[in-house]
Amino acid sequence: MISQPTLQKLSNFEDKSLLIVDDDNPFRQRLARAMEKKGFTVTQAESVKVGIETVKSQSPAFAVVDLRLNDGNGLEVVKEIQKVNLKSRII
């Protein structure tokens, strides 16, 4: 039997940094506002290039990454996140 992951409250996490990488500006901004209201400290990136630069300087605890970006594949950002912070939770 496969065990289900336990949901944790955001208050249980010391680092509440969230990186949102998406080239759809209105969507990214709406999501950022919603997540800030939930208690996250949000950083936004509109491209693979900016996403990778942000990851190198900030190492987010959480990330929401669009895989289809104008300048490349969002998996490049995901790989960079995994290099700098194996504990990051990525969607």
Question: How would you label these PLM feature ranges?
Answer:
Residues 47, 73-76:
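Acidic catalytic/metal-coordinating carboxylates
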Residues 1-19:
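Non-catalytic signal-transmission and effector/linker regions of two-component phosphorelay proteins
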